[in-house]
């Protein structure tokens, strides 16, 4: 039996030519940084460097920072990406040249109508949407929304108490995920759910499906290797967001608008209602109001952007406090002194608590949930005296910078004092960037901090947290694109007294 297929000469020539063309395609851009004299890890044909993310992008970036210094080049498939770490370079990209060159984030995947969301939209469309949304995230608006949010602090205490009373260590992510989901659904859509105790509520089940995708899945890898597939998928209405979830929220927003028009009531202060209210302003700027599709996209992106970040950060904070009991005790003392007898905080009091702010900031330094900041150049540009063409990606490895000994003594240690009033002045805002920086920073930053601080106050008023045999020490991080622990964080939870306010 012949081991080699019996093809005609023409077939063999065609096969060989196809392989040559495939190899040329798979490597055509991979000499880009070498020509410029910029160091970096060697890319693989088709994949570039993405397979090196299997241990986590954060791990890959730290290795590159140590090996290549302040700047290096990498490849996501055929896409050249320039990594920069110098504060002046970062400021130029995120602030000085934001509107002229680096307006847009990298568009990696098919998202359908979700490209209208503020974090995914581009150029003038992004500027208009951001301008419309920004007034909804001011301190004044958040104070109006605070009465909606504070009830979920009590639900959080009740749910955690129920788990703690079982006498077993508690897996935090499920409890904190429910708190995060409840607040997001309430503030984005004005719907009250207790997601921990009602996991089959359609709002809960459809929202949770938004997060179920793997950045190293065959679908997403196909886009990395063959970027032109994104346009094909868009034409076929294939998106990374589940179709049934998008359909559910589309119907809900449509129904909410109909009810709004019928009742002509505008007193609710959730984001959906505020966006619908803005459509009714009859002024010279009315042509800039958000369309129905844009309102839908913002409502969904609030869930997508807020759920994982809040629940994961809360888990990281409680782990840090449990493994640093002196810090936990000091924070409880500040809370008890500021809010005696488990008094409920006001928005202003909560935001003025100095040690609470220090603990949150230090946790966000150690565990920034989004461990990279990325932009796509829309014009030719210069960095460090070198010229780069339009279409070059630029990446800031924020996790690596947050753990860089050049800027942080003993960078892997949890030390809230780094963010004291005295020390905070010495922190470079282009090194510490848990919410990004510049005009395209996280629009929901104030909202996220409010949710985190409310949860921390209510939890530490009522409980103390301790490591147990199931607690992983030291904590190992996972490989997901959004930073998570490799294994769920499990802690022992002890009531501070018998009477828990709000439970």
Swiss-Prot record:
Gene3D superfamilies in the cross-refs: Cytochrome P450
One GO CC term, this protein: endoplasmic reticulum membrane
Cofactor: heme
Catalytic activity of the protein: an organic molecule + reduced [NADPH--hemoprotein reductase] + O2 = an alcohol + oxidized [NADPH--hemoprotein reductase] + H2O + H(+)
Pfam families from the UniProt entry: p450 (PF00067)
Enzyme class: oxidoreductase
Gene Ontology terms: biological process: oxidative demethylation; steroid metabolic process
Inducing stimuli: P450 can be induced to high levels in liver and other tissues by various foreign compounds, including drugs, pesticides, and carcinogens.
Main location: endoplasmic reticulum
One function term, GO molecular function aspect: testosterone 6-beta-hydroxylase activity
Residue numbers binding heme: 442
Source organism superkingdom: Eukaryota
Subcellular localization: Endoplasmic reticulum membrane; Microsome membrane
Keyword annotations from UniProtKB, A to Z: Endoplasmic reticulum, Heme, Iron, Membrane, Metal-binding, Microsome, Monooxygenase, Oxidoreductase
Enzyme Commission number(s): 1.14.14.1
Entry similarity comment: Belongs to the cytochrome P450 family.
Annotated function: Cytochromes P450 are a group of heme-thiolate monooxygenases. In liver microsomes, this enzyme is involved in an NADPH-dependent electron transport pathway. It oxidizes a variety of structurally unrelated compounds, including steroids, fatty acids, and xenobiotics.
Protein name according to UniProt: Cytochrome P450 3A14
Source organism phylogeny: Eukaryota, Metazoa, Chordata, Craniata, Vertebrata
